[in-house]
């Protein structure tokens, strides 16, 4: 925790909930108030997170850790933008040749039974990391197992599986409506393995109305939590606009040409 004049010591909590499997993952909900913990032993548990104290509480066990007869291996995961769905990718065990991307409905009375397999990947293709991007879509990497040692790829190993990311276009929607499109985002000749960058959300903003939302000044300037970026800039005419409006706020996008003439307008 950080105050205006102090960096606090690390906060350590021992959950003591999964002790056998390696490769633990922690994934925070976009609003920062929940955290999901998964591991390769098939463990999945969600916690409340207090952004003011840095403490976790109220664990909700979704899947216990498996120590034998393994039937699931959670490799990566991410929340939907609305925080009500959780997407997990799995890896395969030695006697299984298939990995998956699975959607869970966190509002369901029985979350394990809400599992919806969006796609299965058969060896030599292996499911990798999945991440929520600033455009509110999910992007997923895959590894193509060409042989030992796996990394790096030889120049000759290029295909649709390792030169594209898969995309969930509408991750707030359940089932087929989320529009999972495998190997649909071309990387311009770059190739994927199991991972994707881990990019912290520095645009989350303050927890409005919370006990730690107390910093004031003599001349306080009230601003909305607005995120907006254009890339590349400058461009050749082809560019991407990413934006995130303040909660429950609308806006308008207007693009002007070099003479100041409006050439595009859209309500957001």
Which residue stretches match the model-derived regions?
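Beta-propeller fold recognition
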Residues: 1-49, 55-62, 70-217
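C-terminal outer-membrane/trafficking sorting elements
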Residues: 222-268
